[in-house]
């Protein structure tokens, strides 16, 4: 089993781990930054959860940057894209339509070594997706059916419920996500509260060993130790408006230098540098999404001028 992927999954749990401590906690920082308990961080996140659970809409600007080092074996046609810096930006609005189903309008752009492409995706009702991506799909809008996005899917309550259920399952299996963080701090500045923390990789791997149904072999433990030493950065932060408690920004940084023994298993990958930054705005401000006229049903044979057939 390739354990090199485990830290990437663990970073995704960083935000969830912030709010998994027990107790209500209290207090905070009136300026600068100070260390806080998991319970205190959890109380800040609870206030944010309460503020977003009935949210009807929000704007967002998400930027993902990835740098992969090494000569990736077997990358094929994607080699040029993977051998240099890659960035993806998603910018738009998402919320609830009048009927209670989800709606969204998102512009996206992917930049990579040797090229780029951009497009737009929208849905006025959560039932039909409309996509415009000239480089890959040709001119005009294309439509394809979506499974209906209900009101929970459009807001935060469904996500919060799923996260809570996932944390409960981990705890029942013997893991404690509340201990996955270190260097936890809370700062207040310019009308924002910011929670920051590093992922405790050693504790994450210890919990992985605990909950593993098939057990951890000596070889697995060696790999996990190598991965733990290879990780240079696993940091996350969440910012909220101090008055409304609505999220304003989220950032995740992850960096890893693979040792030679892991590079072979990772198809020649030597390093990973990832940065995700999401800014939130326009909370509960309605927006209009209209189905584009003249959209044609999506046909994969039209991809890349017929190469998708």
Q: Residue ranges of each PLM-predicted region?
A:
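C-terminal motif of bacterial Sec signal peptides marking the signal peptidase cleavage site
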Residues: 14-17
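Bacterial N-terminal signal peptides that target proteins for export
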Residues: 1-8
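Subset-of-secretome marker
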Residues: 3, 19-309
């Amino acid at each position: 089993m390739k354990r090199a992927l485990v830290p990437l999954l663990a970073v995704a749990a960083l935000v969830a781990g912030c709010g998994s401590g027990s107790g209500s906690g209290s207090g905070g920082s009136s300026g600068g930054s100070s260390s806080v308990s998991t319970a205190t961080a959890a109380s800040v996140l609870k206030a944010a959860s309460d503020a977003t659970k009935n949210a009807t809409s929000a704007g967002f600007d998400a930027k993902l940057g990835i740098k992969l080092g090494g000569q990736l074996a077997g990358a094929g046609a994607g080699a040029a894209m993977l051998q240099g810096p890659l960035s993806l930006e998603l910018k738009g609005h998402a919320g609830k339509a009048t009927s209670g189903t989800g709606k969204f309008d998102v512009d996206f752009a992917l930049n990579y070594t040797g090229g780029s492409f951009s497009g737009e995706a929208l849905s006025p009702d959560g039932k039909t997706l409309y996509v415009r991506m000239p480089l890959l799909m040709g001119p005009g809008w294309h439509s394809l059916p979506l499974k209906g996005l209900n009101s929970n899917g459009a807001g935060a309550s469904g996500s919060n419920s799923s996260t809570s259920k996932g944390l409960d399952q981990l705890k029942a299996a013997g893991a404690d996500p509340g201990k996955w963080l270190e260097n936890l701090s809370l700062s207040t500045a310019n009308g924002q509260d910011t929670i920051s923390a590093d992922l405790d990789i050693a504790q994450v791997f210890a919990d992985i060993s605990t909950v593993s149904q098939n057990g951890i072999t000596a070889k697995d433990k060696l790999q996990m130790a190598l991965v733990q030493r290879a990780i240079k950065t696993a940091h996350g932060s969440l910012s909220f408006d101090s008055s409304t408690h609505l999220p304003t920004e989220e950032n995740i940084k992850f960096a890893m230098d693979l040792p030679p023994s892991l590079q072979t298993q990772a198809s020649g990958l030597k390093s990973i540098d990832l940065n995700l930054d999401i800014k939130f705005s326009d909370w509960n401000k309605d927006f209009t999404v209209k189905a584009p006229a003249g959209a044609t049903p999506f046909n994969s044979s039209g991809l890349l001028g017929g190469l998708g057939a």
